[in-house]
Amino acid sequence: HLEVAAHLYGPDDGKPVIALHGWLDNAATFSRLAPRLQGLRIVALDLPGHGHSDHRPIGAGYNIWDYAHDVLQVAEQFGWQRFSLLGHSMGAIVSVLLAGALPERVERLALIDGVIPYTGEADSAPQKLGSALEALLAVNDKRKPVYASFDQAVEARMKGVGAVSREAAEMLAQRGLMPVPGGYTWRTDPRLMLPSAMRLTRAHALAFVSRVACPTSLVLAEQGLMMQPELLELVESFPFDIRRLAGGHHLHLDDDIGAEAVARVFNSFLHD
């Protein structure tokens, strides 16, 4: 079995919510937002391969749908037959996949700047698998970067995928870094950087969205990753309550103003 770490927020008898972070992040992504959400029992996970959770065994991969199984295992452990999901970025995508696959288990979806995975059409699948296999052969030669100081690691994270504020990078780093000879490195499994062997097609992804049966609130960041016109048009056709808020991809973590704005949307939504 895999050991999965989590940060718990809110009263034991609060409404059950499982919170899922984005790719290469960890549970600390919710450290500004979660305390502002009232009356909820929030289990903010470090997904496998991230933060303090175990890495998947040798030979296993990190397909996005495997995280849906991890979430269900956690729900089983808490005895939660029905629960809500709070997801950011990749965590929002996993939330939609799970809510589409098992609509009877999910009560509400609260999503931040993420909905459907990167898709790939059938004709590109052989090349995609080829690149993934080659990357897999080379993975053992890859070394994770070592940063001489905590600050250097924070600086690097500020410029990483979905740039974040210094405070946000510090919060992610406090949970995500570990000391090694010569400084610090991220706890994340280097295999998370491998390209996907298979992608869902656009039709696959939309089929999951169409099977979501619960109320869904989606916060889009004005300076986030979902502002391309084509993607925006697609997302605005979904039967979700959509709010656009000022801020970048990590608007819920970058500063108190962003966290407060997201909390206002989700507090009323999760208690309707």
Regions found by a protein language model. Name each.
Residues 141-199:
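Conserved alpha/beta-hydrolase catalytic His-Asp/Glu region
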Residues 7-55:
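Conserved HGGG/HGGXW glycine-rich cap/lid loop of the alpha/beta-hydrolase fold
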Residues 2, 43-86:
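Active-site loop/oxyanion-hole signature of alpha/beta-hydrolase fold enzymes
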Residues 80-124:
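Conserved hydrolase catalytic core segment
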Residues 112-146:
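A catalytic-pocket lid/entrance helix-loop region that shapes and gates access to the active site
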Residues 1-17, 38-41, 80-81, 116, ...:
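Alpha/beta-hydrolase fold catalytic core
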